Amino acid sequence: VNGRVYLNNQPYIQKLVLDQGYWKESLITAPDEEAYKNDIIKCKEMGFNGCRKHEKVEDPVYLYWADKLGFLVWGSMASFWSYTPQAAETFTKEWMDIIERDYNHPCIVVWDMLNESWGVTQIYENKQQQAFASSLYYMAKAYDQTRLVISNDGWEMCQTDICAVHSYMHGEKGDTAQHLRFE
């Protein structure tokens, strides 16, 4: 509302960690269910109130603990390698299944399906890829009008409820004038 995110009818600042979901012991699957709970508790102890899952559909057990512990989640999808009609069809079916599976988790506050144009590398000029990203946005909205949706997080956003800019400076002094455009 008015450019702000609200939770329980109150303005809410999301302080999120970008969560790759890697586990030292077991790579991208938690070593056990308790690990999910402990991971969320550690994030909260560090001052974060949620996470943006990165290129990973999270296990429902993680979402269960996020629900129980009051930890926000941006539900995400892993990118495909390159755009083809078959890849788009498969991706779309899987994404809709994920939304249907995870819809009832109150921890999810954003659906975030594409990341930085991965898999849709020509989206800036390619009308088919733009239509694909837009269709994902509208399908997510058709399934779930209660959550915010980002069609392509960080870069070329055809349709979006949140303007999320990924700016990588790696220690250099940033161009604050560029970032002020979004205030």
Regions from the PLM with identified roles:
Residues 1-45, 150:
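N-terminal carbohydrate-binding accessory modules
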Residues 38-41, 50-183:
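Substrate-binding/catalytic cleft of secreted carbohydrate-active enzymes
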